[in-house]
Amino acid sequence: EHLDAALAKGKGVILLTGHFTSMELGGRLIMLKKPCYVMFRQLNNLLFNAVMMKFRTLHSEGTVLRDDPRPMVRALKKNKIVWYAPDQDFGPRSSVFATFFGVTAATVPATARIVKMSGAAVIPFVPRREKDGTYTLSLGEALKDFPAGDDVDDAQTINDLIEREVRIAPEQYLWIHRRFKTQPGEEKASLYKKGRSGFSRE
């Protein structure tokens, strides 16, 4: 309902999600009903990168690389859907600082900027595994008054949206992505430390 209403406006839809454990399954399921373009970040592991790229290209309408958002804007202007998960730490150069669960987190302002360029609607999309083993796909109402015009405020809006969904089932969020790795100013030292099994909070 919300997705169809947004598409009826003819300016494309950003299907905004977070890095949940069922995000790949959720993306595949939604694309059985609605073809989507997929935003993809190149991975350091070349083999895994090739596998992921092949999978997403095979099951999507097209793949958009994070380093070049122009194809994403073009797709939106053609009233297409773009599946996008912006909740990763890409370092200080491409981010602003907003809070996530009360902790400062480097947050990309790209969502708001792309909406400004395209006029697209932003629809929250959350795949979730239920207690009975089934999966639900939640499509929310398009964000209102977004973007507001300030990069930090707009980044906070996105973080708050994802945080609300994570709180419903925090065990289904991919915390392994080290969301709080980059910190500003005097807090620049990482909040993570190396351990025998990887990284953990201090």
Where are these regions (language model features)?
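Alpha-helix initiation/capping motif
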Residues: 1-2, 45, 65, 108
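Nucleotide-sugar donor-binding and catalytic loop/hinge architecture
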Residues: 1-11
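Non-catalytic C-terminal accessory region of glycerolipid acyltransferases
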Residues: 5-7, 32-35, 67-202
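Catalytic core of membrane glycerolipid acyltransferases/transacylases, capturing the structured
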Residues: 9-67, 78, 89-99, 103
